[in-house]
Amino acid sequence: MSVWICLVCASLLSCAGQLCQKQATRPSRRGRRSRHILFWLGMALLCLGCGMLLWLSVLQSIPVSIAYPMLSLNFVWVTLAGWGIWHEPVARRHWLGVGLIVVGIVILGTSV
């Protein structure tokens, strides 16, 4: 698997873990709160663990000075997910920041 694909997958898994944690805090049906929390926190651990393993393989191939800034993709994924899944409001400034992050990632990625 390409190291760049691994990097994107590691980022997506990290974000999935964060989103599962958010979902664990959401209301659930009465009497099912403990099961709800345990399920989503378990999913978070699974996603974060798999993301970490992929991240380790990325670090074997790419200098950390290049790889780590690429994780700023997480801000993009989480913003899109919060807006799309939970309909969280996102201000124009926030969208501008997300756009600048994407531009920075493209510049960094093409400099390798």
From Swiss-Prot:
Superkingdom of source: Bacteria
TM region(s), chain numbering: 37-57, 66-86, 89-109
Pfam families: EamA
GO molecular function, one term: carbohydrate derivative transmembrane transporter activity
Membrane topology: Multi-pass membrane protein
Subcellular location per the Swiss-Prot or TrEMBL entry: Cell inner membrane
Listed GO biological process terms: lipid A biosynthetic process; lipopolysaccharide biosynthetic process
Leader peptide range in chain numbering: none
Location of the EamA domain: 35-110
Pathway the protein acts in: Bacterial outer membrane biogenesis; lipopolysaccharide biosynthesis
Keyword terms, alphabetized: Cell inner membrane, Cell membrane, Lipid A biosynthesis, Lipid biosynthesis, Lipid metabolism, Lipopolysaccharide biosynthesis, Membrane, Transmembrane, Transmembrane helix, Transport
Keyword Cell inner membrane part of the UniProt annotation: yes
An annotated GO cellular component: plasma membrane
Family of this protein: Belongs to the ArnE family.
Assembly mode: Heterodimer of ArnE and ArnF.
Chain's role: Translocates 4-amino-4-deoxy-L-arabinose-phosphoundecaprenol (alpha-L-Ara4N-phosphoundecaprenol) from the cytoplasmic to the periplasmic side of the inner membrane.
Matching HAMAP family: Flippase_ArnE
Name assigned to this protein: Probable 4-amino-4-deoxy-L-arabinose-phosphoundecaprenol flippase subunit ArnE
The encoding gene: arnE
